[in-house]
Amino acid sequence: KLTGYYKYIPKSVNRGGHGELTNGKMDKCSIYIALCKWSSRFRVNTQTGTFVDLNSSDIIAYGELSDAEASRTDMKEYEKFEIDIKYRNLTTEPTYILIVASASKYGDYFTGGEGSSLYIDEFELGFDYNAASFTNE
């Protein structure tokens, strides 16, 4: 489980347009964690369209901030978040931990609201057993 505190101040999307975020809509943040089986570090390259494929079999486990939490527009103070990590593969040992926090969910596609701000504090990666992490629900 990944926990921490966040404060998100979104702006209207005024750059690009990707997925559900088009010009004029309110920006969304993104916080996620993935446990990966890679042979070396993964390098994102926006010029060649090289991005992490979160549906790849190399992603052993994954968890993300809920859409409702990522869409908040009324935050005045830091608020706690908890992201459960769901395992997709119980037999492969991951080699990398990937943690992403972005003020614009599709910032890697050059989409977002200029001035959207995401503040993060007290990241903690918990290792207590959680049965829910090992189900496909």
Give the predicted meaning of each segment.
Residues 17, 46-48, 98, 111-116:
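Surface-exposed beta-strand edges and their flanking turn/coil or helix-capping segments
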Residues 75-77, 92-96, 104-128:
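Extracellular carbohydrate recognition
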Residues 13-16, 41-45, 93, 109, ...:
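Short acidic, gly/pro-rich beta-turn/loop elements at beta-sheet edges
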Residues 1-40:
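Extracellular-facing segments of soluble proteins and assemblies that are Gly/Ser/Thr-biased and enriched
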Residues 40-94, 113:
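Extracellular carbohydrate recognition and processing domains
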Residues 19-28, 85-95:
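Short, surface-exposed loop and linker segments with low hydrophobicity and enrichment for Pro/Ser/Thr
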Residues 1-7, 32-34, 80-86, 96-100, ...:
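Residues within well-ordered beta-strands of beta-sheet-rich folds
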Residues 128-137:
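Residue-level detector of functionally pivotal "anchor" positions at catalytic/ligand-binding pockets or at interdomain
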